[in-house]
Curated annotation (Swiss-Prot):
Quaternary structure and interacting proteins, as annotated: NDH is composed of at least 16 different subunits, 5 of which are encoded in the nucleus.
Origin organism lineage: Eukaryota, Viridiplantae, Streptophyta, Embryophyta, Tracheophyta
Entry similarity comment: Belongs to the complex I 30 kDa subunit family.
Function recorded in the entry: NDH shuttles electrons from NAD(P)H:plastoquinone, via FMN and iron-sulfur (Fe-S) centers, to quinones in the photosynthetic chain and possibly in a chloroplast respiratory chain. The immediate electron acceptor for the enzyme in this species is believed to be plastoquinone. Couples the redox reaction to proton translocation, and thus conserves the redox energy in a proton gradient.
Name of the protein in question: NAD(P)H-quinone oxidoreductase subunit J, chloroplastic
Topology term for the membrane: Peripheral membrane protein
Subcellular location: Plastid, Chloroplast thylakoid membrane
Keywords carried by this UniProt record: Chloroplast, Membrane, NAD, NADP, Plastid, Plastoquinone, Quinone, Thylakoid, Translocase, Transport
GO process annotations (BP): photosynthesis, light reaction
MF (Gene Ontology): NADH dehydrogenase (ubiquinone) activity; quinone binding
Reaction it catalyzes: a plastoquinone + NADH + (n+1) H(+)(in) = a plastoquinol + NAD(+) + n H(+)(out); a plastoquinone + NADPH + (n+1) H(+)(in) = a plastoquinol + NADP(+) + n H(+)(out)
E.C. no: 7.1.1.-
């Protein structure tokens, strides 16, 4: 099912895949990582001037990873602002997605958290480093295939 934004992107020949709507009627689009920079700029020009949230998740154990962006079109006279959910799927072996820090500054800490927990590399992010875990931490704690270090091994490390 194609929504209004998907039709607009198709009209402008921007590659995407409509995934339907969520329970609130928000359109969900899948974007390939290599298409994300140009589509992000197009969405900003379209009016999506606010990145409400960015998160990531592990799709399946040993499978792919996903980065999710929730964008909102904030206007003075809008009591029901238009929203869209963008999903970008990457392989676990090479989890690279272009950063949108240069478009939405609010993605700074959010992309860093996704990097810290899942190991997704946001290319061209100005400060991509761990934000929650110590710099010396090994692995990506929220991946489904993550093996938790033995508590006593960690205790001995301090």
């Amino acid at each position: 099912m194609q929504g209004r934004l998907s039709a607009w992107l198709a009209k402008h020949q921007l590659a995407h895949r409509p995934l339907g709507f969520d329970y609130q009627g928000i359109e969900i689009l899948q974007i390939r990582p290599q298409d994300w920079p140009s589509i992000a700029v197009a969405l900003y020009v379209y009016g999506f001037n606010y990145l409400r949230s960015q998160c990531a998740y592990d799709v399946t154990p040993g499978g792919g990873l996903a980065s999710v962006y929730h964008l909102t079109k904030v206007q003075d006279d809008a009591d029901q602002p238009e929203e869209v959910c963008i999903k970008i799927f990457v392989s676990r072996e090479d989890p690279r997605i272009p950063s949108v820090f240069w478009i939405w500054k609010s993605s700074d800490f959010q992309e860093r958290e996704s990097y810290d927990m899942f190991g997704i590399i946001y290319e061209s992010h100005p400060r991509l480093k761990r934000i929650l875990m110590p710099e010396s931490w090994i692995g990506w704690p929220l991946r489904k295939d993550y093996i938790v270090p033995n508590f006593y091994e960690l205790q001995d490390a301090y």
